[in-house]
Amino acid sequence: MFDLYLKNLLDLSDSGTVVLAKLPEAYAIFDPIVDVLPVIPVFFLLLAFVWQASVSFR
């Protein structure tokens, strides 16, 4: 029973990725954007290192 609960909770999509929530059908066109959104904070972290390297890590 717990295994069935996990399968429904994690809901593996066709591509094998874990989907924790699905957008309503009206917003299906935004799926590619929503997939990229969690990566944006990582870009800011990398930008901080690039910025510090450009000012010679003062």
Swiss-Prot record:
It is found in: Plastid, Chloroplast thylakoid membrane. It is a single-pass membrane protein. The chain crosses the membrane at residues 29-49. One of its GO terms (cellular component) is chloroplast thylakoid membrane. Keywords: Chloroplast, Membrane, Photosynthesis, Photosystem II, Plastid, Reaction center, Thylakoid, Transmembrane, Transmembrane helix. Its main location: plastid. The keyword Nucleus does not apply. GO terms for biological process: photosynthesis. Residues 1-21 form a propeptide. It comes from the Eukaryota. Pfam families: PsbK. PANTHER family: PHOTOSYSTEM II REACTION CENTER PROTEIN K (PTHR35325:SF1), PTHR35325. Belongs to the PsbK family. One of the components of the core complex of photosystem II (PSII). PSII is a light-driven water:plastoquinone oxidoreductase that uses light energy to abstract electrons from H(2)O, generating O(2) and a proton gradient subsequently used for ATP formation. It consists of a core antenna complex that captures photons, and an electron transfer chain that converts photonic excitation into a charge separation. PSII is composed of 1 copy each of membrane proteins PsbA, PsbB, PsbC, PsbD, PsbE, PsbF, PsbH, PsbI, PsbJ, PsbK, PsbL, PsbM, PsbT, PsbX, PsbY, PsbZ, Psb30/Ycf12, at least 3 peripheral proteins of the oxygen-evolving complex and a large number of cofactors. It forms dimeric complexes. This is Photosystem II reaction center protein K. The lineage of its organism: Eukaryota, Viridiplantae, Streptophyta, Zygnematophyceae, Zygnematophycidae.
